[in-house]
């Protein structure tokens, strides 16, 4: 977060605005990740884990409530006070936030498609449905982000992936998939950073 704020500041974006933008992005990313995971549970079919997690459907309305502009503004100003920044009132409409949430939902589904082909590149047997993979990788990212103890959720994200993927793959295969995903993400991040730095 601090890195994004710093780089935005170098481009002339006020620190308060960039901080609010990054905070909103992460909030939407977390809420959408949880919602996508919960909404894809019916695609688990007869998998043992899927039938035991239907109680998480209650998180759907909870996530939508947390995105109400009044609560978002309150949480944002709390974060600004903690960091010693002046408070601000952002006039976000609920429809705007829900639209952004929908776009993040599409992102997680595309992420599931990408991981389907990533797994297919190293594993030739049958794979879980794409919605299941989308939900697994979404909630694994959320778990890694919320851990706050390791950079980029290192270890926590992989552990979550291995646990959830092990309902469909042998544990050693799930472990390889988790590591392969981390490697691909790291290479992608470095490539994007190199391109941005060069421009």
Predicted feature residues:
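Transmembrane alpha-helix boundary and packing residues in multipass membrane permease domains
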Residues: 5-6, 116-120, 163
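Membrane-interface alpha-helices at helix entry/exit sites of multi-pass transporters
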Residues: 1, 9-26, 170-180
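Predominantly cytoplasmic-facing regulatory/coupling regions of multi-pass membrane proteins
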Residues: 41-145, 170-199
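Mid-bilayer segments of alpha-helical transmembrane spans in multi-pass integral membrane proteins
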Residues: 1-2, 26-38, 66
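Transmembrane helix boundary and interhelical junction motifs in multipass membrane proteins
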Residues: 1-4, 143-162
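Helix-to-coil boundary motifs at intracellular loop junctions of multi-pass secondary transporters
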Residues: 10-11, 121, 164, 168
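Select subsegments of transmembrane alpha-helices in polytopic membrane proteins
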Residues: 23-32, 100-107
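Short, membrane-exposed interhelical loops at transmembrane-helix boundaries
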Residues: 160-174
């Amino acid at each position: 977060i601090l890195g994004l704020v710093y780089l935005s500041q170098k481009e002339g974006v006020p620190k308060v605005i960039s901080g609010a933008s990054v905070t909103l992005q992460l909030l939407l990313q977390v809420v959408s990740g949880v919602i996508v995971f919960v909404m894809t549970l019916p695609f688990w079919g007869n998998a043992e884990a899927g039938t035991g997690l239907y109680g998480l459907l209650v998180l759907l309305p909870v996530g939508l409530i947390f995105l109400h502009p009044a609560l978002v503004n309150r949480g944002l100003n709390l974060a600004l006070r903690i960091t010693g920044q002046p408070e601000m009132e952002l006039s976000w409409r609920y429809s705007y936030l829900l639209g952004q949430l929908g776009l993040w939902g599409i992102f997680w589904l595309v992420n599931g498609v990408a991981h389907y082909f990533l797994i297919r590149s190293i594993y030739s047997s049958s794979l879980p449905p794409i919605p299941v993979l989308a939900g697994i990788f979404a909630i694994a990212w959320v778990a890694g982000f919320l851990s706050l103890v390791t950079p980029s959720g290192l270890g926590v994200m992989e552990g979550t992936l291995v646990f959830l993927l092990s309902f469909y793959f042998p544990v050693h295969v799930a472990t390889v998939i988790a590591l392969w995903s981390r490697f691909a993400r790291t290479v992608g991040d470095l490539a994007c950073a190199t391109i941005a730095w060069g421009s």
